[in-house]
């Protein structure tokens, strides 16, 4: 609430939200600046140097006049002296004020004098012109002679020493996280360098960058549930791109041999630690080559990015030290499954035989695919994928899941395709393109089911693309690694939200903002789509960001899957009954063992963790909460 009112007899006391008072005071200071003839929001800065340049080039700049601008992060006044630290995108620099050296307030020049410096607050954007010097304590500083206010901040920054702890706030107000946390600022800066390195690498290999449509009359190039929109000017429905692949192939048909696009992709599907509905990819197409060319290309590109954008080749990826200087492994999918299960899917006679393998891998029968090839892929996902730690190129996918790829001449049940796996995570998909228009049309027509148009399994009939192929597409191959997955690897993050500056979240309008701007309050959006760790959940409970209601239910889930020669057990929780939230998913624990685990014992372990960690945290947040622990629909 904006204000709380107590009525003591005839006396009424009103307690105003402290943020309201601070905001009003700062608005008053902005008005005071105007009364002095100074704009609190001038249009231009006279900056000549960034803070880091002043520090790095001190030997050349000492005693010279420079102008530095940035956000005021600290300010300390001691009589006729004052000290401040100003932050820009390169770092921080100290401003040193002597009353007699600072130019007086001057509306014409825009200077704010020492006597009026009280109109400046932490968080304001300021500018100083002065002489580069070193203080008696040895700190490189700027002896201020002219001082300007460039932007009056109306809201105070959170505690810069504690930083932001509430994950909901970090994701919604990433700008605050970056202002307060140098590590976050550097992480997103490094991602821009990564994208620049990709362009440099591809341009150096002779590729040409093209812009391809994000709004498409027919989505294609993959299987995913699309976002639909309506174009009023054309009077028809269209789709946001799930892929740009088919447009790149049109470019190759037009005669451009090496093309690429760095575009936005939209898939109306789930949100978790490695998936987001809107994401970026770099897609390439190379004429007169096959998928083996791209195996070398993608390996070289990752190594170039590591060295160019990050200055190293070793990265901690999901707890594993990966060295991109080492050659990548290459592995046939059928051989990988054979190695882990002892079954060669290439020799299976019936889909029932394939299902028996999945049954031994504890795959639920409801998830059994309809073909041997698709069953092999499911076995790969369960038995092989988690063990692919070192960068690995897995090739030889079944044709059932690869309608756009060219079949292998040696065995047409499989296609010339490979996927990239790093630290157990799929990071890109690549293949030799099917350029036979008759064969491709037959495949598409066989899979075409109009009733599934808006589902994730619909295979569209893009007749315009088929027509383009009939004019002749040369032998072509393409790659398509996701930029967010790459950023997770190179910045050593485990959650995709931490490499997306503006992650997609439900709209939220706080009570303070509703009162301030005269709009309707929209409570904090649920965090059910966030994959929270137990520690994050505890912190949000302790801070009051999450509040348990009178009744909370906790559903533990334990799953086992092979991890190389060992077995991995993973436990997670579903929590219901947190105020204003839906179901919250919590990652619990993982354990790896040589033997087949006792799942009942593992369930008890997870239950004990729930009792000692989750239940205790909920009870501290709300001692009156009744907690029910549920396993497989039954109360334990």
For the regions a language model picked out, list residue spans one by one.
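Short, surface-exposed ligand-recognition loops at beta-strand->loop->(often short) alpha-helix junctions
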Residues: 557-563
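Extended Gly/Ser/Thr-rich low-complexity repeat segments
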Residues: 602-619
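Intrinsically disordered, low-complexity regulatory segments enriched in Ser/Thr/Pro
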Residues: 577-604
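A short amphipathic beta-strand at an alpha->beta junction
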Residues: 623-635
